[in-house]
Amino acid sequence: MDFTTTEAAQDLGGLVDTIVDAVCTPEHQRELDKLEQRFDRELWRKLIDAGILSSAAPESLGGDGFGVLEQVAVLVALGHQLAAVPYLESVVLAAGALARFGSPELQQGWGVSAVSGDRILTVALDGEMGEGPVQAAGTGHGYRLTGTRTQVGYGPVADAFLVPAETDSGAAVFLVAAGDPGVAVTALATTGLGSVGHLELNGAKVDAARRVGGTDVAVWLGTLSTLSRTAFQLGVLERGLQMTAEYARTREQFDRPIGSFQAVGQRLADGYIDVKGLRLTLTQAAWRVAEDSLASRECPQPADIDVATAGFWAAEAGHRVAHTIVHVHGGVGVDTDHPVHRYFLAAKQTEFALGGATGQLRRIGRELAETPA
């Protein structure tokens, strides 16, 4: 593999770091807590004005044509300050899927406006435990969708959703507008305190032109969702561990910094190894996905095992480092007046969203079992 990132990725990551560090102060985060939906429109506007949304978007949607490595760099930087913006959902996943699989009409009608920031798109991939997929019944000139999806990021503020569903001829992904009859979104309270919704489709009608594609689209969305969440998690853990190390250097007990105690130092060292392992596997996965995207549009992607490996590290390291952050900070770690508690919550949210470390290991096992020797 190639460990060297691109110059564009370095530049974009640095620019986003500068923007989010300036905007996402502890005071600003507390102001976001007062909103009905935690969507940082001020930061979103600054990212739009700086060209961040369009920089790594496909040229077919009016973007600059950079790719996965650059998007990963942006997501890591957004994670550093727990940025409450739908870059992952709207630009990377939804607009990316439309650019890769959608018709020219869908690209121009929805993808371009997502990349420009005029519309917010999201993806509805997850159902409640034990719940079947959304069902799409043909109606002659379109489909009627029935079912629910949960944990839809930025669902309460989204203009449209990409929804996988089962049809008579197999799986397909549809674009469903928030204003379509039969579409209802309920806001959810979640661990990460973000804008998350429950999507209910009660016979929502979509015409055939809103069909984005088949099984390959759903597979692509699942792979990119895991990769993107992993990138954001890296940013969260990096900054959270930095804050914890700084606290250990300055907090004194028994007339010496607590970081000088062996047990504390070992805990921080373990966290450092976890974060480095996550960065390594994320880099491998992003590079493989980027190579596959350039080589072919066919799915399933051979990068699946690499992405699941990175997802395992994001969940496992997320659990360990999140608890290290709280434990080393002591009482401060659970004081909501201190910003560090937000990193614990964000890390746990991503861990749960990925299905935990065990879920990713099972995914790797299935891929290995199904791969010919």
From Swiss-Prot:
It holds the Pfam family Acyl-CoA_dh_N. Induction: Induced by cholesterol and repressed by KstR. Uncompetitively inhibited by high concentration of 3-OCS-CoA. One of its GO terms (biological process) is cholesterol catabolic process. FAD binds at R251, H327, G331. Its cofactor is FAD. Coiled coil: none annotated. It catalyses: (25S)-3-oxocholest-4-en-26-oyl-CoA + A = 3-oxo-cholest-4,24-dien-26-oyl-CoA + AH2. It is an enzyme of class 1 (oxidoreductase). Keywords: Cholesterol metabolism, FAD, Flavoprotein, Lipid degradation, Lipid metabolism, Oxidoreductase, Steroid metabolism, Sterol metabolism, Virulence. SUPFAM superfamilies: Acyl-CoA dehydrogenase C-terminal domain-like (SSF47203), Acyl-CoA dehydrogenase NM domain-like (SSF56645). The keyword Ion transport does not apply. Its EC number is 1.3.99.-. It comes from the Bacteria. Pathway: Steroid metabolism; cholesterol degradation. Binds 1 FAD per heterodimer. One of its GO terms (molecular function) is acyl-CoA dehydrogenase activity. The keyword Transmembrane does not apply. Involved in the first cycle of side chain dehydrogenation in the beta-oxidation of cholesterol catabolism. It contributes partly to the virulence by increasing the efficiency of beta-oxidation. Catalyzes the dehydrogenation of acyl-CoA ester side chains of (25S)-3-oxo-cholest-4-en-26-oyl-CoA (3-OCS-CoA) to yield (24E)-3-oxo-cholest-4,24-dien-26-oyl-CoA. Also able to dehydrogenate steroyl-CoA such as 3-oxo-chol-4-en-24-oyl-CoA (3-OCO-CoA) as well as 3-oxo-4-pregnene-20-carboxyl-CoA (3-OPC-CoA). It dehydrogenates only (25S)-OCS-CoA diastereomer. Belongs to the acyl-CoA dehydrogenase family. Heterotetramer (dimer of heterodimers) composed of FadE26 and FadE27. This is Acyl-CoA dehydrogenase FadE27. It comes from Mycobacterium tuberculosis (strain ATCC 25618 / H37Rv). The gene is fadE27.
